């Protein structure tokens, strides 16, 4: 029993539909158990060209599971009509067609962050830096050096662990940068742990999805950044709050 976590769908309804299908398969349930809730780390919109279908799928999932969502920087930009890169004319047109849609109601009360059982869930980063756009939590970026940037404020792992500690939190799960990363605060210092995804099982003839996983024990304070749930090999995660599993899937040909 635990939570499925996904981020950066970017209007890719095919990818989020694949996730929804995968977590119902016997193989997934045997490996991870019952899914109690879904956690969306933001960026449902922009870049892709199926925003309506994506938001319809999110509304469907909210009826099937307890769904918690936090705001992403592209969600923030879309809602506030801020120009950001990455969307082609077709994507821009289809997003503009969504203005005024009741499907956008899910953003009405969407928070910037959420926490549960000692873990902070946020799109970008944990720092309280005021209300300037690029310093908001949904725009912050995990990096090796800190400072302001045209793409959002860069923070380091030590800064994140300090911010968590002040709030009595132990772990953080974020998205935003579309690449998995794991930083563990060990007695010997902060260590970036390589993430090596391996097949969950030998692919059988009746397996609908090929699932790869990398499991991380949550026995020390940990920063976990989840890859993007878009494209041909959507990435997401599962946690029971004792172990965190990075997951990548691809559909059977």
Where are the language model's segments positioned?
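Active-site neighborhood of phospho(di)ester-bond hydrolases with catalytic His/Asp-centered motifs
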Residues: 6-7, 37-42, 68-73, 121-122, ...
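Active-site environment of divalent metal-dependent phosphoester hydrolases
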Residues: 10-14, 46-49, 74-80, 127-129, ...
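Beta-strand-turn-beta hairpins that frame and shape the catalytic cleft
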Residues: 1-4, 114-120, 218-222
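Binuclear metal-dependent phosphoesterase catalytic core
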Residues: 185-253
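Alpha-helix termini
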Residues: 23-33, 162, 191, 196, ...
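Active-site neighborhood of divalent metal-dependent phosphoester bond hydrolases
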Residues: 33-35, 47-121, 127-128, 133-159
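N-terminal active-site segment of His-dependent metallophosphoesterases
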Residues: 1-57
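Divalent-metal (often Zn2+) His-rich catalytic cores of metallo-beta-lactamase-fold enzymes
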Residues: 126-141, 171, 177-201
């Amino acid at each position: 029993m635990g939570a499925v976590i996904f981020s950066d769908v970017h209007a890719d309804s095919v990818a989020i539909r694949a996730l929804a299908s995968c977590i119902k398969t016997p193989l997934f349930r045997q490996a991870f158990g019952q899914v109690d809730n879904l956690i969306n780390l933001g960026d449902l919109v922009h870049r892709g060209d199926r925003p309506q279908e994506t938001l319809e799928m999110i509304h469907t999932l909210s009826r099937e599971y307890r769904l918690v969502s936090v705001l992403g920087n592209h969600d923030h930009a879309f809602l506030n009509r801020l120009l950001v890169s990455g969307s082609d004319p077709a994507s821009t047109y289809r997003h503009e067609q969504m203005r005024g849609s009741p499907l956008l109601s899910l953003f009405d009360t969407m928070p910037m962050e959420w926490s549960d059982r000692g873990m902070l869930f946020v799109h970008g980063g944990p720092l309280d830096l005021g209300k300037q756009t690029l310093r908001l939590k949904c725009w912050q970026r995990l990096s090796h050096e800190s400072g302001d940037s045209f793409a959002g404020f860069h923070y380091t792992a030590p800064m994140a662990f300090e911010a968590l500690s002040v709030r009595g939190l132990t772990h953080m799960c974020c998205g935003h940068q579309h690449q998995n990363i794991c930083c563990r605060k060990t007695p010997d210092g902060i260590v970036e742990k390589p993430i090596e995804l391996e097949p969950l099982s030998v692919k059988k003839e009746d397996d609908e999805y090929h699932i790869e996983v990398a499991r991380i024990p949550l026995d020390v304070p940990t920063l976990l950044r989840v890859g993007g749930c878009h494209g041909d090999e959507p990435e997401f995660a599962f946690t029971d709050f004792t172990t965190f599993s990075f997951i990548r899937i691809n559909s059977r040909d």
